[in-house]
Amino acid sequence: MLLTCTNSLKISSQAKEWESKTLTGMSLEQLNKRIRIPASDIEGTMTSRVKEMLSKVELSVSSYDTAWVAMVPTLDSSKQPLFPKSLKWIMENQQPDGSWGLDLSHPLLIKDSLSSTLACVLALQKWNVGQQLVHKGLDFVQSNIWAATDEHQRSPIGFDMIFPSMIEYGRDMGLNLSLNQSLVEAMLLKRDLETKRLFYYLKDKPSNLAYVAEGLNTLNDWKEVMKFQRSNGSLFNSPSSTAAALIHLHDGKCFEYLNSLTKKFGNAVPTIYPFDIYARLFVIDSLEKLGIDRYVREDKEKMLDDIYRCWMQGSEEIFSDPTCCAMAFRILRTNGYAISSDALANFDEKESLFYEKDAKSTLELFKASQTTIFQDEPVLDKINAWTSTYLEKELRDGTIPDKSLHAEVDYALKHIQANLVRLEHRSYIENYNVDNVSLLKASYRFCNVDNRDLLTFSFQDYNMCQSMHRKELDYLEGWIKKCGIDQLEYARQTIKYAAFSIASSIFQPKFSDGRISWAQNSVLTTIVDDFFDYGGSMEELVNLIELVQRWDDHTTIGYKSKEVEILFNAVYSTTNDLADKARILQGRCVKKHMIDSWIFLLKAMLKEAEWARNKIVPTMDDFIPNGYISFALGPIILTSLYLVEPLSEEAVNSEEYEKLYMVISILGRLINDRVATQSDGAQGKLNIVTLEVINGKGAITEEEVQEKVARTIDSNRRELLRMVSQTEGSIVPKACKDFFWTMSNVLHLFYMGDDGYSSPTKMMSAVNAVINEPIVLP
């Protein structure tokens, strides 16, 4: 049933361990021996490097923030710098072209270089030192001032307010700034208009303005700014903001904060501190998006436990920053930690961001809004509304200059419900930003996070897993011929889609048996569904059910047709093979469970066939309990779970297990029936939409039913994600629960036309991306 709406559809692996010979006719046991993953560097040196990245993340220094620290005078005199070693660092770190900054070669970071360079020039001019350096710095600013108004340049937070103000500071100091006067006036006008606008719109959120206080030339009450001083003495963990406050107020706690930074980092300071939580979230998020986090599972879990403790303690580092808060919320919730979305209430409006055009923060908030697990989470609903609108506009207008971020936003918006992680991994790998440069008020990077290593690691791992998927598909194509189901006239060629549907999310090598089971039963249930719809007579349908009920004693019954014989033997031999394999993993025989799932399915399909052929209109109370079983996810999902991880009888008989199956089955039935209303009607089949209209007797229209079904789909999807994510009180293994969530994403992919794969061409491209085409990096 899973594949009923799909359209009909050479690998040259670089790994020498893989052969390209066909596996047609091989047994499942032989296949598993052939595709065993060899020990390699993937589990050796690279894993050690990733663990090192997780254990300690180092941040680059910021010329911009160091310059502001260098401008702070001693507390008893305005003629001497309080941090002379920071001033010395500036004098020793000018680049040959006269600039200061992190990434001088990046063509889109010229605004950042302008800001850092002018700040350093101001520091030198203030203390009347390094005049030659000042002249070289001014030459750089004058030569590159065009970038200050270039909308295609990546802009540091608050640049349009801070940079013009620094020009004014420079003039007041007597700097000879030979800049285009009309351009400077335009920047000053834009700053003033932006300041007025923000004062008006952010009167209830003054912290956003205080973050860029060094750029507010009209700010008279610095004591108001100090309301946002944190327990560590800083303003927003920003050395530049804290230094600006210390210049005006001589606050002791500000001094202690900056003094500790210069001691810790050796005279030059980073653009944000502390940054431990965000840095670790950044690395975890990168590993997840690259598909390699499984190699450091224990380290990741330990780190998430630490982050969760910080969350529960109300860490300022988390809750004061939208990017950090959104990322922490999403990663913690999807990894099973019980946290409330109310923590994101401060970011439920666009104006809550420090910087209006902060696409990175907006994307993180949008992703967080996708993790709704309760029926009433208004904060996430509000965040989803404004972030999706904003990001869609940014894409249309082409105003996201960072190529990697642009690709990530584009993927996130196009695959809201059909987010198949392997496609996300591939997109992220192919668009990965190896420069590892991010922007706050200045650019920064994590010095010991080697993005090139991560990229190499991830693309090798992707291609290795893909090689296994290709071998699995070879085996499945041989199985089709061996079973003879390719001889059935009405049997659609769905094996590629079946293999893709599971490999696109459950890709890990150790789950190969589970993937093969999923694909085999997806094909079998689709063919059986067609047989019950129009391929077989009632006598043949009853015959097939009796054969399955007898199982090993089926020879006493006989076959009513060749089609029945082929179908039964395919179900019989495949289920027996899978049960033998499952027995090894489970330590007990689970064949009866597998057979029962087929019996329940066939009886439900027979009931629907009787309704259709006898033109009976059932009540909704009769249709739904039967309809969720007839959607055929029992053999597909439940059988596969026995080949994933040990699954106790307690878990199989639990309310949690039954509810997972029921919720995903109802979800599938709703998604299918919402889309297939017209096609089902043409075939004389009833579904939830048409039944609701018929039983409503004119009181409800089809459009109203469609809207009702859409709301129910959303409700069930939230409930499913809650059950899959929760860990407290759960006895079903997480790896098994992931199969239910994978099915939800696959159903949206196959049945919904608004997630990017509605055309055969796009679907084929997705199949090839996961199974056939290795990643080739430039």
Curated annotation (Swiss-Prot):
Keyword GTP-binding: no
Family annotation (InterPro entries): Isoprenoid_synthase_dom_sf, Terpene_synth_N, Terpene_synth_N_sf, Terpene_synthase-like, Terpene_synthase_metal-bd, Terpenoid_cyclase/PrenylTrfase
GO biological process, one term: gibberellin biosynthetic process
Pfam family, one: Terpene_synth_C
Molecular functions per Gene Ontology: ent-kaurene synthase activity; magnesium ion binding; terpene synthase activity
Cofactor note: Binds 3 Mg(2+) ions per subunit.
Reactions performed catalytically: ent-copalyl diphosphate = ent-trachylobane + diphosphate; ent-copalyl diphosphate = ent-kaur-16-ene + diphosphate
Subcellular location: Plastid, Chloroplast
Its job: Diterpene cyclase involved in the biosynthesis of labdane-related diterpenoids (LRDs) natural products. Catalyzes the cyclization of ent-CDP into ent-trachylobane as a major and ent-kaurene as a minor product.
Protein name stated in the entry: Ent-trachylobane synthase KSL2, chloroplastic
Species, as recorded: Ricinus communis (Castor bean)
